[in-house]
């Protein structure tokens, strides 16, 4: 047996996660996280990655929206048709820092370097730099044929996510370890405890 060779599509593992029986599992054992798992009913690793990133101050308020869209109770809001490709994997919810950067690139023509400057300005709450970036974002969107009000509204929606947003690679690393511990708990419960 090698933990590095397990399937990340094991329904029994997802059943355990969906049951909320996650005491002892990396990142997934708090009462709030157990409740979030039971409501989400994850069925692929991307759900665990998203939940690890969402279960933080700020983004946590978006867990119900993610779940409602995931389960078809609500239609995802992609903010603008140009952003559907970026936001579709997360049901219209901005979760990762990378999404904020991709939105700036797609909507406002930011280069990857400029998008990273925007992300850093949002994360560090530097008002002067943030105001400069907001003007750049809106001006770029205008050049892309997007109305000023729409661009300003989207900027206001992405701003808090960049502040609290989790880097997807970190969320993925945590989610893989969480899934591996869930696998061990599912198939080796005696050894697990």
For the regions a language model picked out, list residue spans one by one.
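Noncatalytic, beta-rich nucleic-acid-contacting surfaces in large DNA/RNA-processing enzymes
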Residues: 1-193
């Amino acid at each position: 047996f090698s933990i590095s060779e397990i399937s990340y599509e094991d329904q029994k593992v997802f059943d355990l996660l969906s049951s909320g029986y996650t005491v002892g599992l990396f990142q997934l054992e708090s009462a709030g996280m157990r409740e979030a798992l039971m409501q989400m009913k994850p069925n692929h690793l991307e759900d665990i990655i998203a939940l690890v990133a969402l279960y933080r101050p700020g983004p946590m308020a978006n867990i119900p929206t993610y779940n409602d869209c995931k389960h078809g109770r609500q239609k995802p809001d992609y903010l603008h048709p140009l952003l559907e490709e970026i936001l579709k994997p997360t049901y219209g919810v901005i979760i990762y820092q990378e999404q904020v950067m991709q939105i700036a690139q797609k909507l406002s023509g930011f280069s990857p370097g400029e998008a990273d400057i925007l992300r850093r300005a949002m994360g560090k709450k530097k008002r002067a730099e943030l105001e400069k970036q907001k003007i750049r974002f809106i001006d770029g969107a205008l050049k892309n044929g997007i109305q000023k009000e729409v661009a300003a509204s989207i900027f206001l929606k992405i701003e808090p996510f960049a502040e609290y947003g989790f880097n997807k690679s970190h969320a993925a690393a945590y989610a893989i370890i969480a899934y591996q511990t869930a696998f061990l708990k599912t198939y080796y419960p005696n050894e697990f405890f």
